[in-house]
Amino acid sequence: MQRFSFSCYLHWLLLLCFFSGSLLPSAAAWWRGVHEVRVTDLFKDLQCDNLRAKDAFPSLGYALSIGQSRLSYMLQDWLLAAHRKEVMPSNIMPMPGLTPDCFDHLESSSYAPFINAYRQAILSQYPQELQLEAINCKLLAVVAPALYHNYHLANLTGPATWVVPTVGQLHYYASSSIFASSVEVLAAIILLFACIPLVTRVYISFTRLMSPSRRTSSGTLPRRKIL
C-alpha cells in the first residue's frame, strides 16, 4: 500500500511538474513580449541605425531601471546634442526640449530625487534649449532610455538618424503601457484560475491517500463484508 501511495504521489507530482514546465516558458515569453514591444516600437519610430532594441533592452523593466545617474547624464547630453546639433540632421523637426512644467510633472515620479538635484543646474546651464517644443514629460521615463542609448551608441558607431516621436505617438506609448499593465493583471488572474482545478485535484488525491481513516491499525485496507 505504501508503494501504491508513493507511486500515485509521484504520478501527480510529475503531472504538476509537466504542466508547470509547459506553462512557465510560455508565461516567460509572453512577459518578455509585453515588455519589449513598447521599447522596440519606440526604437523603430526613432529610426536609430546600428541598434537593435531587443539587444539593448531584454525587457522594459530593465530599460526603466537603467539608473538615476545614467538618466541624469542623458538629460544633459540630450540638451547638449540639441544645442550643438551633432546628432540631429538639420532637415527634420528639432528635438523636443524640456520646459519647467516637465520638471513639475517629474517631481511626482520615481526620478524625483535626482530631478530636484539637477533641476537648477539644467535650467541655468541650458536656458535657450528649454524653449524647444515641449513633450508630455510624464512620458520622459519611457523615452529617456531610448534616447540615452541612441545618442551614446551614435558616438561609438557613427551618426544615427533621428526621427523625433510626435506628441500623438508619445500618448500612444503611455496608453499602451497602461493597457499592458491591465493585460498583465488579467492574464495573471486567468492563469491563477486555470491552475486552481489542477492544484485542488492533486490536493484531494493526496489527502485521500494519506487519510488514516482508510487504513486499519495493521496498515492494510479493511476487507468488504460479503453478504
Curated annotation (Swiss-Prot):
Disulfide bonds join C48-C137. Pfam families: EAV_GS. The keyword Signal applies. Residues 199-227 are intravirion. It is a single-pass type I membrane protein. Keywords: Clathrin-mediated endocytosis of virus by host, Disulfide bond, Glycoprotein, Host endoplasmic reticulum, Host Golgi apparatus, Host membrane, Host-virus interaction, Membrane, Secreted, Signal, Transmembrane, Transmembrane helix, Viral attachment to host cell, Viral envelope protein, Viral penetration into host cytoplasm, Virion, Virus endocytosis by host, Virus entry into host cell. Residues 29-177 are virion surface. Residues 1-28 form the signal peptide. Glycans are attached at N155. GO terms for biological process: clathrin-dependent endocytosis of virus by host cell; virion attachment to host cell. It comes from the Viruses. The chain crosses the membrane at residues 178-198. GO terms for cellular component: extracellular region; host cell endoplasmic reticulum membrane; host cell Golgi membrane; membrane; viral envelope; virion membrane. InterPro entries: Equi_arteri_GP2b (IPR001913). It is found in: Virion membrane; Host endoplasmic reticulum membrane; Host Golgi apparatus membrane; Secreted. Translated from a subgenomic RNA (sgRNA2). Belongs to the arteriviridae GP2b protein family. Minor envelope protein. Part of the glycoproteins heterotrimer GP2b-GP3-GP4 which is probably responsible for the attachment to target host cell. This attachment induces virion internalization predominantly through clathrin-dependent endocytosis. Heterotrimer of GP2b, GP3, and GP4; disulfide-linked. The GP2b-GP3-GP4 complex associates with the E protein. This is Glycoprotein 2b. It comes from Equine arteritis virus (strain Bucyrus).
